[in-house]
């Protein structure tokens, strides 16, 4: 590499100019690309035909608009510390606007029932007719699941679009398309708004003026077209659209208005903190504040214990709850000692047993661990899944965006809800409302407490890994949740400790089981301070396993499963880590994000040299699952596209094992510039967001105007100027 910017391309726009560094993946020489600058455009397509001999001819314009050459003084400024920092890390404060049809906004009440009470009063601002809607509605997305996928461009061998006709409705239709929602559910609740409408309409004789009377219900006929299989799904026995955990509207309204009752939480918190009044008052109950997770779609670094406009735990509460056990009055802080007290933990036989030995456990993953992704992992062989991290305070305040995170698909046979929070006066009510709503219908098999989140905004509020340094507060929190959940097991996920070199997990583990009643444990083999920068410490995990086994035996308790977590990236490493540490299983996190098929490898105890076409099949499944979950209208398609790009922002880091000189691959190794064994494999390895959008277009149609995508981790964004920021 040279210091001359004319010869060294910008790292964020050149795949083939990455310098060699420790931790570089050993790729076979025939797949390597010469590090001499050759590619400046943000696309992987130019890499397919590049050979080392082309290096001298490949560069057409070496000027960098940011190298300072165009300034009057023609002086080049050396990059400072901030410049270097800006080129790496995370894109924070990402914003994803909601993209709907650029057309007449149809009243949802009228659309689904044919009636709008507000329209009769003249105060509904939405349209109550489909007139004008199809004049601007985008054409159907052409999609058939039986289309062939191939390794060379165009990658998807599509059929011809079959247009419905020249009329205003027919010209938007593709009569040969397949609606993924209809395919999955047997009906489509999106009716005329479906972007795959041609799959569920039929041509009927045009009605003569005055011949057709208005039928009750939604309008199912437009000119010579009639929509079929349009069903407005309702919650039946807790299930809707093959998903469960739909709290009743009355329950959410009561939570928002602070009229819901928490009898157990009130009694328990009065017991452990008699001087502190129990209150869950939402200061703005009449107008629910927009949830930050909705507006900015929070990633881990933006999650806090309270949404915008809703008060979080105050300084007085934090000071009181953070007080050490020695500072507490013994009678006030004592949790155990009275057999009849409400805060005595349930006996082990009163809780459901978690028989997890050998289970294939997918970690809770904020943003990317959504329901369609979990469904994909289950399809590959995962047997234990957990929701994205839900924040206790928004759950207690009835934020619908937070409750959407706990949704469960019918394919998830062992499913838990992970809750984060720092204080008993939020976590115990959250456990109580979970038990009384989704817990009664079998919607949750266990509740997991997040004690591992390392990010500052969570840690500084006493939640996540901060709980490990506050055992007094932690004990009250866990015991209260355990009692509130009834027979639903409570599990904990934690790190080795807060500070590097000062682990304390082994001291807490005996108390987790014998005092606080945890039904299963998961330990991430890094401290909060380490984040993900160092390899997981499996020797320390072994120490923790020994501490658990001894404490369980001494207390004469039934076996309690313990899982390890950290750096699992292959079947070989999975079983090696299990044998070395003695854990009952290994929770897979980043490894599943990069290669969701790792669960197939673990199940079959093999290393899978998965082909590019097989990987594309998995991407197609994710798109189908996403449309079933988020919807097949324009808004649902764009939401699916956004989360598909999120998934590809991790999956592009996978290096095919057929290209490696040694196995198994290591999670933290990064590849030098390389090309795949075919065009598709090269495309799937692209770090450019524009290429991820191109991949999404294979199954979700052309991107809509206004769509932009900013990767969670810095890379080339796709979209307008705001996206580039």
Swiss-Prot record:
Q: What is its main location?
A: cytoplasm
| GO MF entry, a single one | tRNA-dihydrouridine47 synthase activity
Q: Where is the active site?
A: 453 (proton donor)
- Name of the protein: tRNA-dihydrouridine(47) synthase [NAD(P)(+)]
* Compositional bias per record (Basic and acidic residues), positions renumbered to this chain: 51-73, 80-89, 325-337
- The set of disulfide-linked cysteines is none
Query: What taxonomic ancestry is recorded?
Result: Eukaryota, Fungi, Dikarya, Basidiomycota, Agaricomycotina
Entry's localization field? Cytoplasm; Nucleus
One GO process term, biological-process aspect: mRNA processing
Question: Where are the compositionally biased (Basic residues) regions?
Answer: 284-295
